[in-house]
């Protein structure tokens, strides 16, 4: 989840009184808003482990999937949120990432790598921001050290195993401290770890069990039982227990055992109502619901939310097993539809599948397989309520589909108000999914229902056809052959998704332009009897084709006909590869300036801020107003 974020325009001199006041008034009442999910392999239909996270920030915020190449020894990681610096003493590993647009980070291109897999098969989702309590903050405050801007880049660039990633991050916190408190999931083909930065210099990491699930919407004090002496399953800072005991602030469970979560986490009365709303929605989705009135109370004083009567567990047993890939993808789009009083569609409550989602990642881990092929990254670059997750063998990929807009695309379309008449930049799955989602959130009754049904049909076909691709991947024994297939499959999955979604978006625009809303919109490619696609995608066929294929010439897609008439819409052309952007040589030793990127010589960079500090911002806002707005403003991302 996002935290600190410098906005260039707001950092300049002369921010006015009116703007400063408006900024403060617009701040959310619940600043933290990301959701992390874990499902152990004993609970899934395919026997695989799943974990992932939804990042929330704003309604229209551009994200980019890409590949960071390896670098020679001497490469330096740095941050745009703190003074953190770390220089590698070895050749770094290639890894996939999901990053921000450089225009939002002082033109740095490495902003917040967030989620990916490296060439060793280590995956990471970072971060879920949490909060420490005031007692801990007084004795071990945050530092100018490591933070979420750099976590994923360092873990994926440096670690050959998940445990190695945990140990590296822990050692860096020991040395430099942290500038934010976060949870991170780090995994490989054998282990999945939950890492938590608890305070300025204290941390813990727990190897996750195969028979539990977890939903965490930024709550740092969810209960868990851990044996600090079990080094096989728990790693931690040296003074995790002795420091709070020496300071007289340690907390203990009923049986007298040192309680990490209650010692370090925020107090129950300090946790946000929107956080508990999402926790309740998540527990309901996974069929282990909390009971209204007994476990929680709905609060509505102008903002609908929930409060709980006592601290809840970090891990729980779902009410069923056999969870499917589709169900776990859709968990991130959950809007509390089955929770009376906390249904985002009816009651206006915050939701896991909020309109503020910017990116969702889900990692599917096949325990014991070769690290190169063990993990599949399911990636959504827009809001989960109306989006599609694309399967990617990211550990092997060395190139990225041109339908994923790279960081050279304009950020301007994010601010577009009339997306019916003003189309997104050409051949951009990022913007197409953003625009589909915006139209559905604005028109849930006329567009949302059938579009969701269509996207579900598309998602199911991607899942089913990926099984065929996966069989071929597992049959391939060489890294060279696997890499070629991973690149080809990534291109095929992305292109098929783009073409279906672009045609859908064009039909949605035509429906809106026609202005006849007597009948809800129905996509021409949706079979309303089977809720499947009329014309299947060709993902598996394209990925496994042996004959060379000549790509279409790029160009603007044809406009489809009347969406009321069944038929197959025209497909857009294949885009050109993005033009190269001058960059520094691969031997560069800092990420603060340009460096090579496999989509053209793209530069790279940066990350975030402490999400607990709404009150602090309000105080700072008074200073902004009284000083006429001359301040370095830092915008929150959640």
Model-derived features with residue positions:
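Charged low-complexity "KEKE/polyampholyte" interaction tracts
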Residues: 381-388, 392-545
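Long, well-ordered mid-to-C-terminal structural blocks that present hydrophobic/aromatic surfaces
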Residues: 299-409
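Bacterial N-terminal signal peptides that target proteins for export
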Residues: 2-17
């Amino acid at each position: 989840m996002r935290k600190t974020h410098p906005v260039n325009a707001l950092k300049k001199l002369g921010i006015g009184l009116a703007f400063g006041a408006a900024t403060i008034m617009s701040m959310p009442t619940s600043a933290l808003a990301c959701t992390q999910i874990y499902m152990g392999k004993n609970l899934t239909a395919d026997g695989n482990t799943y974990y992932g996270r939804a990042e929330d920030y704003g309604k229209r915020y551009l994200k980019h999937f890409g590949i960071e190449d390896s670098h020679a020894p001497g490469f330096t990681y740095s941050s745009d949120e703190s003074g953190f610096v770390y220089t590698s003493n070895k050749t770094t590993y290639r890894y996939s990432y999901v990053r921000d647009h450089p225009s939002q980070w002082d033109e740095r291109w490495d902003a917040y790598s967030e989620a990916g897999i490296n060439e060793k098969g280590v995956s990471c989702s970072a971060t879920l921001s949490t909060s420490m309590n005031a007692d801990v903050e007084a004795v071990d405050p945050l530092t100018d050290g490591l933070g979420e801007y750099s976590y994923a880049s360092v873990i994926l660039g440096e670690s050959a195993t998940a445990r190695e990633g945990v140990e590296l991050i822990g050692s860096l916190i020991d040395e430099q401290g942290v500038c934010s408190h976060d949870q991170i999931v780090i995994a490989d083909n054998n282990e999945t770890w939950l890492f938590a930065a608890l305070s300025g210099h204290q941390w813990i990491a727990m190897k996750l069990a195969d028979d539990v699930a977890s939903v965490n919407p930024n709550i740092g004090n969810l209960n868990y039982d851990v044996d600090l002496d079990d080094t096989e399953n728990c790693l931690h800072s040296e003074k995790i227990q002795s420091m709070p005991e020496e300071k007289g602030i340690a907390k203990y469970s009923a049986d007298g055992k040192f309680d990490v979560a209650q010692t370090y986490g925020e107090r129950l009365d300090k946790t946000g109502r929107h956080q508990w709303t999402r926790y309740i929605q998540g527990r309901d989705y996974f069929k282990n619901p909390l009971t209204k009135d007994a476990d929680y109370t709905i609060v509505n004083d102008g903002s609908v939310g929930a409060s709980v009567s006592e601290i809840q567990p970090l891990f729980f047993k779902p009410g069923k097993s056999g969870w499917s890939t589709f169900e776990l993808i859709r968990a991130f789009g959950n809007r509390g539809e089955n929770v009376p009083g906390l249904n985002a569609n009816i009651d206006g409550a915050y939701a896991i599948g909020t309109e503020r989602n910017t990116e969702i990642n889900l990692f599917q881990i096949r325990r014991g397989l070769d690290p190169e092929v063990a993990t599949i990254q399911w990636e959504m670059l827009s809001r989960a309520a109306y989006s599609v997750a694309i399967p990617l063998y990211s550990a092997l990929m060395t190139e990225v589909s041109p339908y994923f807009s790279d960081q050279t695309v304009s950020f301007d379309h994010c601010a577009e108000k009339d997306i019916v008449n003003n189309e997104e930049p050409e051949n951009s799955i990022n913007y197409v999914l953003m625009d589909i989602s915006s139209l559905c959130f604005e028109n849930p009754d006329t567009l949302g229902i059938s579009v969701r049904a269509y996207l579900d049909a598309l998602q199911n076909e991607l899942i089913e056809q990926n099984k065929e691709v996966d069989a071929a991947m597992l049959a391939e024994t060489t890294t060279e052959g696997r890499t070629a297939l991973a690149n080809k499959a990534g291109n095929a999955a992305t292109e098929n998704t783009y073409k279906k979604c672009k045609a859908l978006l064009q039909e949605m625009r035509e429906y809106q332009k026609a202005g006849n809303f007597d009948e809800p919109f129905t996509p021409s490619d949706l079979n309303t009897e089977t809720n499947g696609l009329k014309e299947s995608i060709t993902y598996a066929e394209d990925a496994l084709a042996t004959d060379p294929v000549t790509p279409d010439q790029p160009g603007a897609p044809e406009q489809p006909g009347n969406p009321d008439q069944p038929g197959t819409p025209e497909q857009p052309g294949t885009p050109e590869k993005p033009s190269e952007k001058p960059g520094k040589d691969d031997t560069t030793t800092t990420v603060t300036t340009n460096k090579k990127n496999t989509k053209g010589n793209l530069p790279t960079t940066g990350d975030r801020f402490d999400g607990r500090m709404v009150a602090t911002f309000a105080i700072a806002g008074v200073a902004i107003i009284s000083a006429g707005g001359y301040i370095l403003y830092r915008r929150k991302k959640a």
